UniProtKB/Swiss-Prot annotation:
Keywords: Cell projection, Cilium, Cytoplasm, Cytoskeleton, Flagellum, Microtubule. It comes from Giardia intestinalis (strain ATCC 50803 / WB clone C6). This is Gamma-tubulin small complex component GCP2. GO terms for biological process: cytoplasmic microtubule organization; meiotic cell cycle; microtubule nucleation; mitotic cell cycle; mitotic cleavage furrow formation; mitotic cytokinetic process; motile cilium assembly; spindle assembly. It is found in: Cytoplasm, Cytoskeleton, Flagellum axoneme; Cytoplasm, Cytoskeleton, Flagellum basal body; Cytoplasm, Cytoskeleton. Pfam families: GCP_C_terminal, GCP_N_terminal. GO terms for molecular function: gamma-tubulin binding.
Length: 961
């Protein structure tokens, strides 16, 4: 359904209300609005004109061309019944209210033409599509199926658009009506039968509601004869015969209420910044933000009143699931109670404004109003809706809808707001509290005449010293607007959020001015004003006059003298300025001339995500002698010195801000560190199996120097998650380096292939002559090593692919960011996405990889330590080889008669004999070890292969989720 404010008649009413007025005028004269209504009524629109609302400020006569007035509500018979109804301490009877309304002379005084001009209400769904309600015949069939005694069938016989509805009569009723002499008597009898049928249905609905324990408080009906919102006219008998409907071209009360609730139900979830009380930094939280399809008047009213309407949404969702067309009309069952609550909220806030400035005049003395009373009434509506929802779940959706529709029809008899009344009320009344809130805040801050920017700047002085010392105490903005909930209604949080956002932006721009602009050659001493062109960098078109500050708009002291229009301009000005300043703050973070956030991201990608592989390999190899030491004896200063040296000699030497990066020794092992970050409230570490003094390599991490205001984006939780990613990648890199050392060691032993079989003492008869001993004995060892290297390389390739995709996605988010909140939420989502994509949120993945990494390192150390010792050359072997080499170089003469070539050949044979003797000794030792450990290596291979298979299965299951 398109917005009701798109109608040209509504726009003309809106322009009339927003037109400039004289300073002496209080509100738009109702006669002008009524003239517009009558104008469109004469043009053929289906407009039901209602008399104007009585106002204590000005009395306006009804135009001459309007319809005759209908007898007022306060007739003796109706008032007696309503008074007795409101004073009754028992459960309120909806049928009694219907009877009182039906007996009022207004039901007979209304023209018959009105019955045919009932507008059609569009059903409001999520896409606002227009659907026609159920016909009266179908609804009566439903009610007949529910209870044939209480709801007899009434057929809706409609001959044309402008013909009335006639009930389907029984044979006895037809005979009785036919016996009447005149046509008027027969029509009166038909109307009486229809009224009795509706009353029986209402009594049946009330009986069902009473059985379910649903009661109505006295004020639900009694307050209606006190409220000046109640019109002097009543709805005709056709509203009882046929459900309340509405034409698309008409602006009626229940359509506005449905629009409000549709807006609230269509809420969008977004993120904003909130100060953490623990580390004094901004964290991302979730709030509900109303969509901006409709004007701010409807949005404000929705946020203010429907704070306890969860049960109503429960009913709506249940009905929508079963696709019942009555979806958008249940709101009317309690619309009158909502209007009463809204009105009393306005009186309560008007009383606050009157104490400060005396700008508002109360229309009537309504006794002492308190927030507690209003909250109690709202809670009563909430309880009623919960009970109705339970009733629908027990009786079924169709029957529950039928009962709710009858209850809605009964309650609507006591309302009758006209187009003008509802439109003026929603436009003029609902935005006033927004200005009064700022009025109260500024007044309580004892600066009633100052500009809001000065107000913010003065409040921020207490934070400057702490910021200079490296601390972030911007939570002053949240503390500044903490007001006792017992004195301020819940819906005031809306304006508080805008003010906190503007206050945060003011602090950031003041810091930018102090750090960059004031230190430049063109620095000026002009103070930064948030609500001026200097702060936003643009011309503020909304402030047409220099004296129209926030304080003057709150107080209504602008040039127009109209408090309502001043508050509308104020609310719009807050939103516009906040958007412009947020753009400037975002540029402050992204611009390379200032914070250069993209330059810091390059360091994060290169160091934390190890996008430059040569750096990490060089660092581990150069500092491995220190990294393998325990934490208690390692020298962290020497490790950091080697870290800085590797940066200068690697491809990262030209990165900006690389001096901010350094290595640290984390206090926890990786698995404890991971769980403490992901589950800080519930994780209890089990250190029974941990080493009391672990190696530095198992505790190594990174630390990036982040200062204010960069720490608003690179928060502590974000940097902790990035550090976890680095520690995990480091473990995989260390495993690869150790396996490569083992591979080099085994490659050196390939020269043992030259040793003949018969020279090996452990030579077995099972050896086949077509294979050398090195292939047979070393086959298992080589296969195990190759399997481990293949797994580590595949894992690293998978990580590079995942990290590249996450970086590309975050770069798109960075390009599309519109505010600092988008930047913060995007950075937080990026860090969480890295942890999620690598599978570190799964304990199974972490445990399996931890076991596989340990197996790789243990096997590598075993190969290196065992075979390097055996293959080392002893002193005797080295002395013999050196002697032979010296004889070859010096060319000493050999035996007499032997030529030079023969002498060299003799030396080479002698050298080969010495080397072969050494190789035979090494081969015997190596083969003995392999024969003894061949079973253990095969067992380790089986275990490792099972671990790899388990990891692949867990990853597949994790990706499927």
């Amino acid at each position: 359904m398109s917005s009701v404010f798109a109608d040209p008649r509504v726009k003309e009413l809106l322009n009339l209300h927003r037109s400039p007025k004289l300073a002496t005028e209080g509100k738009t004269p109702p006669s002008q609005v009524q003239d517009l209504v009558n104008k469109y009524s004469r043009l053929g629109s289906n407009v039901v004109s209602h008399p104007t609302r009585s106002s204590p400020e000005k009395t306006t006569d009804k135009p001459a061309d309007s319809k005759p007035s209908i007898p007022p509500l306060k007739s003796e018979s109706v008032m007696t019944r309503l008074t007795a109804l409101s004073s009754n301490n028992t459960t309120q009877n909806v049928a009694s209210l219907v009877t009182a309304i039906a007996s009022h002379p207004a039901t007979a005084a209304l023209p018959k033409q009105e019955a045919s001009q009932q507008p059609v209400i569009p059903t409001s769904v999520e896409k606002r599509a227009v659907t026609q309600p159920l016909s009266q015949q179908n609804m009566n069939k439903l009610m007949n199926a529910i209870d044939p005694q209480a709801a007899p069938l009434i057929e809706d016989q409609v001959a044309g658009k402008h013909t009335g509805t006639k009930p389907l009569l029984t044979l006895q009723q037809q005979q009785a009506i036919s016996s009447l002499p005149t046509k008027s008597e027969r029509e009166s009898a038909l109307n009486e039968i229809a009224l009795n049928t509706a009353i029986q249905s209402a009594q049946h609905a009330n009986m069902e509601l009473s059985k379910a324990g649903i009661t109505f408080p006295m004020w639900f009906f009694g307050v209606q004869n006190q409220s000046d919102l109640v019109s002097r006219s009543f709805i005709s008998l056709a509203h009882i015969q046929q459900p309340m409907v509405m034409n698309d071209s008409l602006l009626q009360e229940h359509l506005l209420v449905s629009d409000c609730i549709a807006v609230l139900q269509g809420c969008m979830q977004t993120t904003y910044l909130q100060v953490s009380e623990q580390n004094k930094e901004y964290v991302v939280t979730i709030r509900k933000e109303v969509a901006t399809e409709l004007p701010a008047t409807l949005v404000a009213m929705t946020q203010r009143v429907l704070v306890h309407a969860h049960a109503r949404f429960q009913i709506v969702n249940t009905i929508y699931t079963h696709q019942v067309p009555e979806y958008g009309r249940i709101a009317n069952a309690f619309s009158q109670a909502l209007r009463c609550i809204i009105k009393e909220y306005d009186f309560y806030l008007a009383d606050l404004s009157k104490k400060h400035y005396g700008k508002m005049q109360s229309s009537a003395e309504r006794g002492s109003l308190s927030l507690q009373t209003l909250e109690v009434k709202t809670k009563q509506i909430h309880i009623i809706l919960e009970n109705v929802a339970d009733l629908c779940s027990r009786l079924g959706v169709v029957r529950g809808c039928a009962l709710l529709q009858q209850l809605e029809t009964a309650v609507l008899q006591s309302s009758g707001l006209s187009v003008k009344e509802v439109f003026q009320y929603l436009l003029s009344e609902s935005l006033k509290p927004l200005g009064r809130i700022m009025d109260r805040y500024i007044n309580e801050a004892v600066i009633p005449d100052s500009d809001a920017a000065d107000f913010f700047i003065r409040k921020s002085h207490s934070t400057e010293l702490a910021e200079e010392q490296g601390k972030t105490t911007i939570n002053t903005w949240m503390q500044m607007f903490k007001v006792d909930d017992a004195q301020v209604p819940l819906f005031l949080n809306n304006i508080k959020t805008h003010l906190c956002d503007i206050g945060r932006s003011t602090v950031l721009l003041k810091w930018k001015k102090k750090q960059y602009i004031d230190k430049g050659p063109n620095a000026s001493g002009q103070e930064l004003l948030l609500l001026s062109a200097e702060a936003s960098g643009e011309t503020t078109q909304g402030f047409r006059h220099g004296e129209e500050t926030v304080a003057s708009l709150v107080c209504g002291d602008g040039s127009t003298g109209d408090l309502e229009l001043a508050h509308i301009r104020l609310y719009k000005q807050l939103i516009d300025i906040n958007a412009r300043v947020q753009t400037k703050v975002l540029d402050f973070f992204i611009n390379p001339e200032y914070l250069d956030f993209r330059g810091h991201l390059q360091n994060i990608y290169a160091f934390y995500l190890v996008m430059a592989g040569d750096f990490l390999s060089c660092f581990v190899e150069s500092a491995i002698s220190e990294l393998v030491l325990s934490r208690s004896v390692a020298n962290i200063l020497r490790i950091r010195s080697k870290f800085k040296m590797v940066i200068k000699t690697s491809s990262l030497a030209n990165l900006p801000y690389n001096e901010r990066m350094n290595v640290i020794v984390c206090p926890e092992l990786f698995k404890h560190h991971l769980n403490s970050v992901l589950y800080p409230q519930t994780y209890v570490p089990d250190r029974a199996t941990d080493s009391p003094d672990p190696k530095v390599l198992n505790l190594l991490g990174l630390q990036y120097d982040v200062t204010y205001p960069l720490n608003l984006v690179l928060t502590t939780p974000v940097m902790e998650r990035l550090n976890l990613v680095f520690r995990h990648i480091l473990r995989a890199k260390v495993s690869e380096i150790e396996l490569q050392k083992a591979w080099t060691t085994l490659q050196r032993l390939r020269k043992l292939e030259r040793v003949p079989h018969d020279k090996i003492e452990v030579y077995a008869n099972a050896l086949r002559s077509d294979k050398s001993p090195i292939i047979i004995f070393f086959g298992v060892a080589y296969k195990m090593l190759i399997t481990m290297l293949d797994f580590i390389h595949s894992l690293q390739f998978q990580y590079v692919t995942i990290l590249t995709e996450c970086i590309a996605k975050f770069q798109d988010t960075l390009v599309n960011a519109k505010s600092l909140d988008d930047l913060v939420s995007g950075m937080s989502a990026f860090a969480n996405g890295l942890i999620m994509s690598l599978g570190l949120v799964s304990n199974n993945v972490v445990n399996i990889l931890d076991t596989l990494f340990n197996d790789c390192i243990v096997y590598s150390h075993h190969i290196v330590k065992t075979f390097c010792i055996i293959s080392n050359e002893d002193d005797e072997f080295i002395r013999k080889i050196v002697t032979i080499n010296e004889e070859s170089r010096e060319g000493k003469s050999g035996p007499r008669g032997v030529k030079g070539s023969e002498r060299m050949t003799s030396l080479l044979k002698k050298r080969e004999a010495i080397e072969m003797t050494r190789l035979i000794a090494i081969a015997n030792s190596v083969y003995s070890l392999i024969v003894d450990n061949r079973g253990l290596i095969a067992t380790l291979m089986t275990k490792f292969n099972k671990g790899v298979a388990s990891y692949e299965q867990v990853i597949r299951n994790f990706d499927d989720r």
